[in-house]
Swiss-Prot record:
This is Beta-glucosidase 18. Residues 1-26 form the signal peptide. Expressed in roots, leaves, flowers and pollen. Keywords: Disulfide bond, Glycoprotein, Glycosidase, Hydrolase, Signal. The active site is at residues 194, 408. It comes from Oryza sativa subsp. japonica.
Amino acid sequence: MAGGSKTRIHASLVSTLLLLLPLASAIHRSDFPASFLFGTATSSYQIEGAYLEGNKSLSNWDVFTHLPGNIKDGSNGDIADDHYHRYEEDVELMNSLGVNAYRFSISWSRILPKGRFGGVNPAGIDFYNKLIDSILLKGIQPFVTLTHYDIPQELEDRYGAWLNAEIQSDFGHFADVCFGAFGDRVKYWTTFNEPNVAVRHGYMLGTYPPSRCSPPFGHCARGGDSHAEPYVAAHNVILSHATAIEIYKRKYQSKQRGMIGMVLYSTWYEPLRDVPEDRLATERALAFETPWFLDPLVYGDYPPEMRQILGGRLPSFSPEDRRKLRYKLDFIGVNHYTTLYARDCMFSDCPQGQETQHALAAVTGESNGLPIGTPTAMPTFYVVPDGIEKMVKYFMRRYNNLPMFITENGYAQGGDSYTDAEDWIDDEDRIEYLEGYLTKLAKVIRDGADVRGYFAWSVVDNFEWLFGYTLRFGLYYIDYRTQERSPKLSALWYKEFLQNLHENQ
């Protein structure tokens, strides 16, 4: 009874909100190429749940979230959105939106519970086969990420995961298994999602697993060296990517005819002050974020901006490493949410905190007490649509207009378990965000950027890492007491946008 009553209430609310949708929009589906991919994105740990079902082993995030104090609301992804059991329902949600692509990640722990030290798990292969076949039946292209933060805890316990070159062989084996099992139907692969975030938070700040850091970045019980370990971990990520991409290009690409890339978190930076020092600081802040990983993959070495500051702290690439790096990625995945200010800490006095120790630049979202854009519920996430245009143009210049996909872009709502469903569902701010960013994206494509797709984060509310369930990015609201899905106003807007229903006649 209660569930049916909620359904009627939500349906009534959505019907009312539908009347509030603007009659005309500044952006239309027809402003993008006909072949353009429009989709939604998720990740395995954030939505699947079923953390011990189907012979899956523990991941690093399974362990991390069960340690008290790590997650804001004390929650975890044990159940999350229960996508493991409800994937068919979620595929129907995507189909109802009218998207032609779905970006998701594979749980390494489901496929290889013990890494290369054990066998392939048939139940894991079966789950992703069913998911891939289900979305293809709806005319939706799978866009698959191999690793989105979560790895088997076995590899951390056995040899220290990303701090050990052994992981390159493990990741290569995992990639090989996935290419062989799913590559006949998957035409878009990415090796990693936001390794720049995972490395920074895991080995510099200590706020993500494996929780390693040192002062002034933090005081981690597990120890660590924030001045060295992030660069070792990043080096092993880069060479793991190179291992996987060599396997794909030598063994699979010619017959499977797919593309492969890497997804990076990409903040745009503006100088805090109109002075040369801050303009240089923005260049350093940019280089220490995304080119940290992309420059080696495109040009074979770390950015000169990093070499100048870090010197010998950056590992070197051996002749064998450079041989593998000759196999180039086919596209860049750009996760863009926000724009921040950067202030010089190389030639100027600067507060000595953790943020100044990496690129000798302090970053902030405010200037003289004024935010750079409209704040959102996610700290440091501001609404600055110009940022996506400038970010794409930066990649155009630096990487000779290598093909790009906007693999994540979305708006954070904040609340808690007492927030009414109606407050989540009425998300006009998200519509304004999507409309603004898509307008700027269409403009930069008209200016010549080779951007081939856009994925809204996310199709459904989900577990938002350190923030648990206190932040929601979904186009669909989830009542976690019942797992009921309800469309937010933004889902209706996105659907109508994809159908060109906003276009003035």
